[in-house]
């Protein structure tokens, strides 16, 4: 009987640990959002109608989520891929928004900027992201940051 109890406790421990690991990205995302003071608002449409800084196609845009973001760190192929333009623009918007808030420690900065980037890709259209990034001087920074050897990597 005691062996069965020990085995049962071990299984419960394994299930609780697995559930904790599975929930961790979502919990960190929610914590990061809780640390953000206010939400950025998308810009109005660019007068020219051309919002992107590059000619990269914006078709097939997939909003980010906490689990796919965390999973990319364990996938060598994902780490080698070029970061989609929409994700770079969303990160730029999140970073600029957080710069306007009181400064905090580095861990809080990274957690809140990542969570806000994910939130922006989930709640704004690709056009809203591009227009807002352009308004936030992303195009000027983007042209300076492009490496002569090729596009930025993850």
Enumerate the language-model features and the residues they cover.
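Juxtamembrane regions of bacterial inner-membrane/periplasmic proteins
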Residues: 2-154
């Amino acid at each position: 009987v005691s062996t069965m109890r020990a085995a049962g406790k071990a299984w419960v421990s394994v299930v609780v640990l697995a559930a904790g690991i599975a929930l961790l990205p979502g919990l960190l995302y929610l914590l990061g959002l809780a640390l953000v003071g206010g939400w950025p608002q998308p810009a109005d449409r660019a007068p020219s109608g051309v919002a992107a800084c590059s000619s990269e196609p914006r078709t097939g845009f997939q909003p980010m989520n906490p689990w796919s973001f965390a999973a990319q760190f364990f996938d060598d192929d994902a780490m080698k891929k070029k970061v989609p333009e929409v994700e770079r623009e969303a990160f730029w918007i999140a970073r600029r928004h957080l710069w306007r808030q009181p400064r905090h420690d580095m861990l809080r900065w990274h957690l809140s900027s990542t969570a806000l980037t994910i939130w922006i890709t989930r709640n704004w259209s690709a056009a809203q992201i591009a227009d807002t990034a352009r308004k936030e001087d992303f195009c000027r920074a983007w042209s300076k940051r492009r490496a002569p050897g090729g596009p930025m990597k993850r």
